[in-house]
UniProtKB/Swiss-Prot annotation:
GO CC annotations, alphabetized: cytoplasm
Cofactor: Mg(2+)
Catalytic activity line of the entry: Endonucleolytic cleavage to 5'-phosphomonoester
This protein's name: Ribonuclease H
Subunit note: Monomer.
Length: 154
């Protein structure tokens, strides 16, 4: 485990999809001081990007009060979307540079509300590159998919 500053929440999030669209899952690993919490869930029909957004939303929603948070994701869509593209999309009336509607707008709006509660630093790591906490978040996301598939098989 990497050295972590005290009184900062470290949030590692990941989304996964089997088929795109298809059954998907999200996973979150939270660390605060000596405490650790794992969250996951799944959806029967979704996309990988929707699950990436949902992971960040659910992780931030789980924090009971405003915090300093370091969010680590392997999704450039999530990191660049929240740090670079969101203000531009809003200025353009939720349109991309091609004048098309922004995909997943309701999720982006929900994420923005959650982000406003906290002081956040966003980090990107390459997926499946051996980053221990990101691998745990990935395992949790896949557990979310497995649970959806198990429910569907009943």
């Amino acid at each position: 485990m990497a050295k972590q500053e005290q009184n900062i929440v470290y949030l590692y999030c990941d989304g996964a999809c089997r088929g795109n669209p298809g059954p998907g899952g999200w996973g979150v690993l939270l660390r605060y001081n000596q405490h650790e919490r794992q969250l996951h869930g799944g959806v029967a029909n979704t996309t990988n990007n929707q699950m990436e957004l949902t992971a960040a939303i659910e992780g931030l929603k789980s924090l009971k009060k405003p915090c300093q948070v370091v969010v680590t994701t392997d999704s450039q869509y999530l990191r660049r979307g929240i740090t670079e593209w969101l203000p531009v999309w809003k200025r353009r009336g939720w349109r991309t540079s091609n004048k098309k509607p922004v995909k997943n707008q309701p999720l982006w709006e929900t994420l923005e509300r959650e982000v406003e509660r906290h002081t956040i630093v966003w980090h990107w790591v390459k997926g499946h590159s051996g980053h221990a906490e990101n691998e745990i978040a990935d395992e949790l996301a896949n557990r979310g998919i497995d649970e959806v598939l198990k429910r569907g098989a009943r």
